[in-house]
UniProtKB/Swiss-Prot annotation:
Keywords, ordered alphabetically: Disulfide bond, Secreted, Signal
Protein's name according to its UniProt entry: Secreted Ly-6/uPAR domain-containing protein 2
Disulfide bonding pattern of the chain: 25-47, 28-34, 40-68, 72-88, 89-94
Keyword Signal found: yes
Taxonomic lineage from the root: Eukaryota, Metazoa, Chordata, Craniata, Vertebrata
Main location class: secreted
Amino acid sequence: MQFHTGLLLAAVLSLQLAAAQALWCHQCTGFGGCSRGSRCPRDSTHCVTTATRVLSNIENLPLVTKMCHTGCPDIPSLGLGPYVSIACCQTSLCNHD
């Protein structure tokens, strides 16, 4: 019985460690920036921030989108146009303003 208890405890601790190491990123969209941290899907490896200049925007603030992603995408893979910048990072909540 003691062996089973130890095995169960090891399994629970392993799950807690995996959850603690999960990547967290800001995931939101807003003009000029935004922040809302949340846990990423298990396969995510990067936090990504895109900034798109909207030519009709009176205040000239970029539309900022923050998300989790598998890898660091390039602009064509996201289907975005020429007025876009992308920044990627790999630590939790690293895609802050």
